[in-house]
């Protein structure tokens, strides 16, 4: 179920103020955040946001196609180690 339109998208307050301050100054700077649940809004386009994946901050360059998605979608939390070549059970 999607979020109500009258509420609007969720964006963490500290992240929104940092983006607005950089937009006023006209600067492009990496913004570090732990807020994976924040929705990408049009004001974030062109910025690089370092999203925490549980271990490190993954840099995410925000483009127009990302608007409406969550920041956490672009910072994977799990790494897949491939199945071993000799193990036939895992491949079937």
UniProtKB/Swiss-Prot annotation:
Keywords: Ribonucleoprotein, Ribosomal protein, RNA-binding, rRNA-binding. InterPro entries: Ribosomal_uS19 (IPR002222), Ribosomal_uS19_bac-type (IPR005732), Ribosomal_uS19_CS (IPR020934), Ribosomal_uS19_SF (IPR023575). Signal peptide: none annotated. GO terms for cellular component: cytoplasm; small ribosomal subunit. It comes from the Bacteria. Gene3D superfamilies: 30s Ribosomal Protein S19, Chain A. The keyword Ribonucleoprotein applies. GO terms for biological process: ribosomal small subunit assembly; translation. Belongs to the universal ribosomal protein uS19 family. Protein S19 forms a complex with S13 that binds strongly to the 16S ribosomal RNA. This is Small ribosomal subunit protein uS19. It comes from Acaryochloris marina (strain MBIC 11017). The gene is rpsS.
